[in-house]
Swiss-Prot record:
GO terms for cellular component: cytoplasm; cytoskeleton; plasma membrane. One of its GO terms (molecular function) is small GTPase binding. CDD domains: CRIB. PROSITE patterns: CRIB. Transmembrane segments: none annotated. It is found in: Cytoplasm, Cytoskeleton; Cell membrane. Residues 29-42 form the CRIB domain. Keywords: Cell membrane, Cell shape, Cytoplasm, Cytoskeleton, Lipoprotein, Membrane, Palmitate. A lipid is attached at C10, C11 (S-palmitoyl cysteine). It comes from Xenopus laevis. Belongs to the CDC42SE/SPEC family. The keyword Phosphoprotein does not apply. This is CDC42 small effector protein 2-C. Probably involved in the organization of the actin cytoskeleton by acting downstream of CDC42, inducing actin filament assembly.
């Protein structure tokens, strides 16, 4: 059997090792850039999804917004 492999050693080369992905840790991750908060999504909202039709802004208005004069601390 070793003679057989010896004859075809030119065709059966050693396979290159797959490149390992570089591990990412917290120090490599920065603050979000150009982040715009649009809405809060609760667990009940996951099953309903977005209504078909209408613009994205109209769909987000149905989620509610921030009322002027009420801080998040008061909520």
């Amino acid at each position: 059997m070793t003679e057989f492999l010896f004859c075809f050693s030119c065709c059966i080369g050693e396979q290159p090792q797959p490149k390992r992905r570089r591990r990412i840790d917290r120090s490599m991750i920065g603050e979000p850039m150009n982040f715009v908060h649009t809405a809060h999504v609760g667990s009940g909202d996951a099953n309903t999804g977005f209504a078909m039709g209408g613009s994205f802004q109209d769909q987000m208005k149905s989620k509610g917004g921030y009322t002027p004069g009420i801080s998040e601390v008061a909520l």
